[in-house]
Amino acid sequence: MRVNIYSAILFLLVSNHFAFAQSEVIFPFFIDQVSVPLLAAGQTGTANLTTEALGFYFNPAQLGYSSRFNNFAFSFMPSITNIPAFLPITTRSYGLQAGYDFNKINKSIPLTIGVGFVHSYLNYGKFTFTGSQSPAALIEYEPEDSYNSISLGAGYKYFAYFNLGFSLKMFHSLLTKQITANGIKDAEADGTSIDLGALVILPLSELWFNKTIFNINGYTIKPKSNFSFGYAINNIGEKVYFFDPAQSDPLPRIARLGYNLNFGLDIQIKNVELNLIDYSFTGEADDILVKRDTTGIKYDGMFGKLIPGKHLISLVSDKNIVVHKAHTISLFETITYSTGRVNGRQYQIIKTEGVGISTEGLLKLLCAFTENKVLNYITGHFTLEYSRANLNYAVYQNTLPSNNRKYESIALYIKNFDF
């Protein structure tokens, strides 16, 4: 009985992230975004056009897109993130991606291929078991959930850009420790799950505005616009148990559907092309496909209860569907600001916002007005980015010391190498 109560307490603590009144699932942190820039943008990631190092976690098809730009990218959280709860819960993530655009070496091969890796964990703090006759600690342990996710994505251009992706997630969970007649035993579970994703990008400016050019004070300015639509289904796998197979719980299988519209202006300064301004709007919706009733566990179809007209166009959430919406604006490829909102599935509104600072635009401007081969080489091949996201959760209102979560990440990008 003690173990069952403890398991329930841990589940409730983690579930302050999202409400799962419609179903009981294990490892709800699997559905959390790990990319800090996308956390800031309303916890989106299904349809955004992102080159962020961990931007493929929700939708592995993103690797087909980002491989057009990144040869290699690495991102990590420099410090752990504290999750407000009744226990000292912390989380941290890091990962990388590598890719190649074959079109750069052969124009007849409009193909990109990328691979990615993500590691993430959720730690519940330190627990101590004491004996009935003495306060001395018999066992000290730290419950933790973690996973390693390996992804593969590919993209192909035929008027539009078509991208597909696949992820294999290997997870481990240490729930508690038990004192048995044969010694101390770990209550733990291991398993695997898969993610599938698709992303279609319609390059509006390439198709219809490619020859539209403005000349202002000697500077050449061109419009840029894309529309993308994405779908992903995450955490397809077997049920998990710690003690009794008859008491196993399903993984949080989730369907995601979304779109992104972005437009901006590129400016030519001498021999350097710089993105002057870029704005994007993202709308996404997701549904937990797991349902439990008196007959057992059931799974909805690949789209669940998602209704595009209601949940994506009108952006109306309900008791089953979570709706994400985000605005992102970038200036001079240097400063990015994102803001978003998340609501639905019986929890209150989550507000997100964040900023990013990149060396990309600043170095391009320096190259435009200076003659330095070393600087030109660094600018053409390397970029550093710092990102910060703030999430305001209103789930427990005033029952927690703070409902704000702060995430930070540092990323390195290597690009434009032709092998």
What are the roles of these predicted feature ranges?
Residues 1-26, 327:
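Bacterial Sec-dependent N-terminal signal peptides
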Residues 22-419:
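Subset of outer-membrane beta-barrel
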